[in-house]
């Protein structure tokens, strides 16, 4: 039966990895795999266990209890992501991200490279690397007319956005998972991973700035800055970003799960959105057509934002996290971790392999698996290194991260072009940051 379980999981995993080749959304194999695995466990009356992290051993449990336990842990992540996604969509409803374009005052390609890289690094730490990439590539399309130049910039945005997401508990779904699961605290994650992430960003940008693609000036007119469609755009941008940043502080003060703070932040942002939208503003360009408002129904910014949420991503996370939970409940991951430690005693090598692996396969199941494999306590450096490796390793292939996939779609970036031109920069940045992390850990933070 163990062989059947492993085959089903690997088949589902392969389908997720090959979603672009198979042309099916990865949520389909994730949900199917999850349901089939738990059905087999139930029908075959297989023994399920809960990992006792303190004693580092497996304790027998009942399927109803263990499934409810894992559903609760997964729901914490999903509700948190729903709140964050809605806040970002509310900012977009008021065209708040157009404010960022106003910061761009230079035509120098090299200065623009640094500007976009720093913006990607900071933005992704707040609104996550996927959303930051969408926002910056959209701005890129308005600022740079030459497509070949845009490809280079988009490639660098992928690297820097992923680096920016790795050090923040709200910057990447994998760091969010580790944070919500009480593997890392926000402060210690920042202390351990911020400097390696900066190295991971700066090294590739320094190397790329010597390329011909980033020499000279761009030809487009920077001065033709379009103001946000709403006068409340800048206010909603800063309010929304501030509300998301507030969540880690809320968790630290109250010791409540992060999704509670995110719901409070969403309520605050939504309140201001409703107040501002009552001033007859609508992002729709056809709002002046007589009778159009009534036809559209309730044009609430919250309703509109909720309708734009990336629900397939939420369902994918539900499927993959509960599928990995099935393997964890059977004790497979715990036993595999023991075998792995015997085969490769140096955990740093294991974690760096995780990082390289996250470029090939999705980093969400990788991190979910690592959480089931290792039982180290809160803020053990292992978890911080996993956060760094899984967050930044995906940059080595364009399909290795959500930021890469979305940039690939928006700019039609060729897989092999990225592999040839950008991948080595991502690898050098990843390796430099990893070395920096190990040196900091061994000689500065844990002397």
Regions found by a protein language model. Give the residues of each.
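Transmembrane helical segments that form the transport core of multi-pass membrane transport proteins
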Residues: 94, 101-103, 112, 116, ...
């Amino acid at each position: 039966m163990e062989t059947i379980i492993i085959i089903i999981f690997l088949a589902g995993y392969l389908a997720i990895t090959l979603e672009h080749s198979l042309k099916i959304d990865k949520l389909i194999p994730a949900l199917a795999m999850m349901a089939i695995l738990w059905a087999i466990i139930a029908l075959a009356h297989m023994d399920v266990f809960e990992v006792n992290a303190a004693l580092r051993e497996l304790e027998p449990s009942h399927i109803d209890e263990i499934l409810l336990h894992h559903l609760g842990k997964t729901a914490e992540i999903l509700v948190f992501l729903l709140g964050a996604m809605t806040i970002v969509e509310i900012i977009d409803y008021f065209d708040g991200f157009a404010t960022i374009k106003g910061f761009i005052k230079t035509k120098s390609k090299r200065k623009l490279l640094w500007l976009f890289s720093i913006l990607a690094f900071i933005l992704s730490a707040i609104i996550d690397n996927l959303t930051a990439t969408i926002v910056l590539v959209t701005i890129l399309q308005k600022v740079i007319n030459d497509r070949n130049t845009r490809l280079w910039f988009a490639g660098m945005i992928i690297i820097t956005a992923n680096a920016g997401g790795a050090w923040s508990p709200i910057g990447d779904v994998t760091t969010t998972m580790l944070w919500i699961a009480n593997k890392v605290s926000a402060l210690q994650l920042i202390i351990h991973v911020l400097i390696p992430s900066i190295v991971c960003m700066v090294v590739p940008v320094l190397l790329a700035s010597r390329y011909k693609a980033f020499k000279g000036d761009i030809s487009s007119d920077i001065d033709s800055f379009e103001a946000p469609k709403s006068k409340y755009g800048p206010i909603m941008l800063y309010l929304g970003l501030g509300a998301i940043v507030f969540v880690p502080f809320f968790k630290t003060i109250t010791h409540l799960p992060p999704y509670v703070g995110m719901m409070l932040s969403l309520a605050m942002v939504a309140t201001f959105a409703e107040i501002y939208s009552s001033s007859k503003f609508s992002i729709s360009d056809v709002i002046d057509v007589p009778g159009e408002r009534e036809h559209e129904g309730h044009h609430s910014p919250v309703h509109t934002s909720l309708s734009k949420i990336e629900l397939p991503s939420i369902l994918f996370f539900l499927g993959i996290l509960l599928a990995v939970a099935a393997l964890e409940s059977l004790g497979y991951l715990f036993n595999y971790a023991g075998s792995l430690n015997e085969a490769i005693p140096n955990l740093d090598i294991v974690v760096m392999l995780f990082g390289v692996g996250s470029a090939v396969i999705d980093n969400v199941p990788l991190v979910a698996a690592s959480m089931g494999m290792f039982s180290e306590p809160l803020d053990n450096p292992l978890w911080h290194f996993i956060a760094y490796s899984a967050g930044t390793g995906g940059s080595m292939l364009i399909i290795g991260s959500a930021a890469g996939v979305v940039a690939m779609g928006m700019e039609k970036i060729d897989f092999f072009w990225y592999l040839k031109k950008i991948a080595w920069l991502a690898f050098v940045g990843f390796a430099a940051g990893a070395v920096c992390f190990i040196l900091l850990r061994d000689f500065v933070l844990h002397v």
